[in-house]
Structures are given as structure tokens and as C-alpha cells.
Swiss-Prot record:
The active site is at 36 (nucleophile), 139 (proton acceptor). This is Josephin-1. It comes from the Eukaryota. Residues 23-202 form the Josephin domain. Interacts with beta-actin/ACTB. The gene is Josd1. It comes from Rattus norvegicus.
Length: 202
């Protein structure tokens, strides 16, 4: 099964639909170039200054000290399409950890109150200007709670996508995790990771 756009419960979403304008209190960093990892991180922290392209590039270089970077390769490597190791190291600089979620587990055991947000890696359509190409590429997105509701803060969206409460969030996560090549990271404070208190079954 491929990762298709989240539709949710149509009847429920129509009855609880929010105004079209994005709530002003939500920070939603939009896609530019291929900086989806940067956008996902800043959207998780709800802070445009949490990380910069230069910060992530420095982390990449630290993790790969033997990489010979010519000006041409530096441009390629700095395109923002960073792997999970860069994201995990970036979170650690802020006192947070990324917990990889085993897709065989039930998302019902996630202690949502102890999770700041989620970063997902899933296939996304490639676009050339206004044209959507018949190709897929892995893409980082952020999902988190703001003002008592959960939102999909995918940087490719024009505005935050309202998911709903905890029950709707779990349905959203289950839906995507059933798909091929979809992975989930739980963003939690260091002490939560140390005590595994992101789990409701411990």
C-alpha cells in the first residue's frame, strides 16, 4: 500500500471543518528547494530560528568528517535532503531525542502527553513547477499539537492540515504507517527518552 493523502473521516471533518485561513498561532514553514528536513524540524519547534540550513550542513559534516566536499558537491549535499542521522543529531543539540517507532506496535500505546511532536518520512510526489510528476521521493513532514488540536505541518501544504484530537491523530498515524516506506519518529525530551515514558504501557 502506498502512502496516500490523508482523508480522515469525511463526514466528521466536514462537520468540524476549521476556517480556511490558517490559525495565526501556528508556525508553518513552507517548502523551498529540498529543505524538507529543515522545515520539519522548525515546524516541530514552532520556531523559524530553531535551525538553519547552515546548522544542518555543519552537523552533516561533523557526522561525515571524511567527506571531501568540492563546491559542486557541497551544493548537492546541502540541498536539505538530509537523512535521519542529521535530524537526530540536530534534535540532541536542543535537548531532545528522536525515538524510532516500530511499525509492528500499536500507536495506541504512545503516551501523547509526553511527546512534543512527530517527524514522518514518507513518499511524496515530485513536482516541476505546477506539474506533478509520476515519481515519488522520500519526504520529511512534521505533525504536532497546537492549541489542543493536532496538525499536519507538511511543508508542501499551502496551510496547516487539521487532524483533530488524540483519537484522530492515532488514526492518521495508523493510516500512514500501513503504507510502504513510511517511518515515524517521536520527538521527546531527553528525560522522556531515558525513562521511556513516551510509552503508556510501562
Amino acid at each position: 500500500m502506498s502512502c496516500m493523502p490523508w482523508k480522515g473521516d469525511k463526514a466528521k471533518s466536514e462537520s468540524l471543518e476549521l476556517p480556511q485561513a490558517a490559525p495565526p498561532q501556528i508556525y508553518h514553514e513552507k517548502q523551498r528547494r529540498e529543505l524538507c528536513a529543515l522545515h520539519a524540524l522548525n515546524n516541530v519547534f514552532q520556531d523559524s530560528n530553531a535551525f538553519t540550513r547552515e546548522t544542518l550542513q555543519e552537523i552533516f559534516q561533523r557526522l561525515s568528517p571524511n567527506t571531501v566536499v568540492t563546491p559542486h558537491k557541497k551544493s548537492m549535499l546541502g540541498n536539505g535532503n538530509y537523512d535521519v542521522n542529521v535530524i537526530m543529531a540536530a534534535l540532541q543539540t536542543k535537548g531532545y531525542e528522536a525515538v524510532w517507532w516500530d511499525k509492528r506496535r500499536d500507536v495506541g500505546v504512545i503516551a501523547l502527553a509526553n511527546v512534543m511532536g512527530f517527524i514522518m518520512n514518507l513518499p511524496s510526489s515530485l513536482c516541476w513547477g505546477p506539474l506533478k510528476l509520476p515519481l515519488k521521493r522520500q519526504h520529511w513532514i512534521c505533525v504536532r499539537e497546537v492549541g489542543g488540536a493536532y496538525y499536519n505541518l507538511d511543508s508542501k501544504l499551502k496551510m496547516p492540515e487539521w487532524i483533530g484530537g488524540e483519537s484522530e491523530l492515532r488514526k492518521f498515524l495508523k493510516y500512514h504507517l500501513r503504507g510502504k516506506n513510511c517511518e515515524l519518529l517521536l520527538v521527546v525530551p531527553e528525560e522522556v527518552e531515558a525513562h521511556q515514558s513516551w510509552r503508556a504501557d510501562v
